[in-house]
Amino acid sequence: DYCCRRPPCTLIC
């Protein structure tokens, strides 16, 4: 999985 947003990650692609 890839973090779509910068930390803190609230959305996972």
UniProtKB/Swiss-Prot annotation:
Cysteine disulfide partners in this protein: 3-9, 4-13
4-hydroxyproline: residues carrying this PTM: 7-8
GO CC aspect terms: extracellular region; host cell postsynaptic membrane
GO molecular function, one term: ion channel regulator activity
Alphabetical keyword list: Acetylcholine receptor inhibiting toxin, Amidation, Disulfide bond, Hydroxylation, Ion channel impairing toxin, Neurotoxin, Postsynaptic neurotoxin, Secreted, Toxin
Main localization (coarse): secreted
Family that this chain belongs to: Belongs to the conotoxin A superfamily.
Record's function text: Alpha-conotoxins act on postsynaptic membranes, they bind to the nicotinic acetylcholine receptors (nAChR) and thus inhibit them.
Comment, domains: The cysteine framework is I (CC-C-C). Alpha4/3 pattern.
Protein name: Alpha-conotoxin-like Reg1f
Species for this entry: Conus regius
